[in-house]
């Protein structure tokens, strides 16, 4: 009986952990430490992904939320809640896409099939922007205003902790990567300081590489668009 009891418990999976931490911005140009993405990549093999479906709203001439994190294979909906036409596009290497022009009360969707950082804009409104961070892992979080983040149900193992901040250079972010060893229970990762020093913000252009017009054509077809 004792042997069977021990054998039964030996095949039970190890309990998952809750991993948390804080990210602090230095040399920040904008108040608040929210909107940074933190994720864990297993050092051995790849974690099983469950693609999701999330929403990036267009309302009051803004994308909301401004920063979105999704696992590879996820679908993002871009509903237009404004009484004017909108568009969503990206020419960046993460995954270029273009929804075309679409009317108020309608929506477009994009499936993000590869990891990367996707900077999203509207081809009509130059002030509209967002970032979609597509990660190769189910273990990720977006920081709150105080820089805090938390991930639940992380299996025990060795991971590489990685970060994304839209106003930090790749060199800065690469230097902050660290090995994290997760066991069961709670794990608090040491505070990470991210500097915005060295990042140069350049005004973006339309999907055709042109300057935005001084006054957008919001209520109908526009030159050069779909």
Indicate where each model-derived feature is located.
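Sec-dependent signal peptide recognition
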Residues: 1-8
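Extracytoplasmic copper-binding redox domains, predominantly the cupredoxin/blue-copper superfamily
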Residues: 17-226
């Amino acid at each position: 009986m004792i042997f069977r009891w021990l054998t039964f418990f030996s095949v039970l999976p190890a309990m998952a952990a809750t991993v948390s931490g804080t990210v602090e911005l230095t040399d920040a140009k904008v108040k608040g430490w929210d909107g940074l993405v933190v994720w864990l990549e297993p050092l051995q093999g790849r974690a099983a992904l469950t693609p999701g479906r999330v929403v990036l709203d267009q309302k009051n001439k803004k994308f909301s939320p401004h920063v979105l994190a999704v696992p590879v294979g996820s679908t993002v909906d871009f509903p237009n809640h404004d009484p004017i036409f909108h568009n969503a596009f990206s020419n960046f290497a993460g995954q270029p896409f273009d929804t075309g022009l679409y009317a108020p009360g309608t929506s477009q969707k994009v499936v993000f099939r590869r990891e990367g950082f996707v900077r999203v804009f509207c081809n009509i409104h130059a002030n509209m922007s967002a970032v979609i961070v597509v990660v190769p892992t189910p273990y990720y979080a977006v920081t709150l205003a105080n820089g805090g983040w938390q991930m639940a149900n992380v299996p025990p193992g060795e991971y590489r902790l990685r970060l994304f901040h839209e106003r930090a250079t790749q060199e800065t972010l690469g230097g902050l990567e660290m090995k994290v060893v997760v066991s069961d229970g709670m794990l608090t990762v040491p505070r990470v300081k991210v500097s915005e020093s060295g990042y140069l913000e350049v005004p973006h252009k339309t999907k055709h590489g042109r300057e935005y017009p001084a006054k957008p054509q919001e209520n109908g077809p526009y030159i050069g668009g779909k």
